[in-house]
Amino acid sequence: MPKAARTRAQQRRFEWTLLAMALLALVAWLSPPGQLAGPNHLIQDLGLRALARPPHPDIVLVAVDDRSIATIGRWPWRRALHAQLLQTISAQQPQAIGLDILFSEADADYPQDDALLAQAIAASQRVALPVLQRNYAGLAEGQSELPLDMFTQAAAALGHVHVAPDGDGVVRGLYLQEGPADAPWSHLSQALQCIAQPHAQGCKPQALTEPLSAVGNGSPAPWAVRQHELIAYAGGPAHYPTYSYIDVLRGQVPSDA
């Protein structure tokens, strides 16, 4: 093809590309809010798949799986077992431990187990526990549901565990700050990072620099959210090394896990 013809063809492709981009921008501008959520989610999901990366070598999951339930029995389990698990994990000197189980009530059947678990949490000095938002009779709207006081005092940190799925049921983001507007909780993942890296950005107490938006039925509510972040997934559900609860409890995992 002559050079002049190639130049004209390239110019036409450039012009068509600009036109297509302008039309897409116009469609996005004219579309009602949320109308392009599907395409946006598709593009985001494809981008995350393209950016899949190896799991961080310092992150390990301990799962309450079917084999553990078959061996130990149905849930809930005795808190003495959780205390033993924490002791086993803490012996490996991890940077942080997230125990994503809410212990908001005393154990009526085995009250001595509460003391054992609190002692294991305190001895570790690395355990973060979850905080929930509850809206039911007996709790004010948006009130936090915390672990028992003995567990709260023993824990190195608390963090909220709320996520809001998109319209298609997929969780693509979370709020790093959520809770009572005057003192929101960090997300549990951020709480874990701050235990492991206390000098990391956002780990020191800071005054709120962004406005908090109240959630609920449109009227001001005590529960608020802040700092929405997209989740940069490293990979699929089985991407991170995962060990069975019962195997960890029995010490049947590699010492360098």
Model feature map: region roles:
Residues 2-224, 253, 257:
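Non-transmembrane functional regions of envelope-associated proteins
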Residues 113, 229-230:
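Conserved acidic
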Residues 225-227, 234-257:
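Acidic, S/T/G-rich, low-cysteine, solvent-exposed domains in lumenal/extracellular/periplasmic regions
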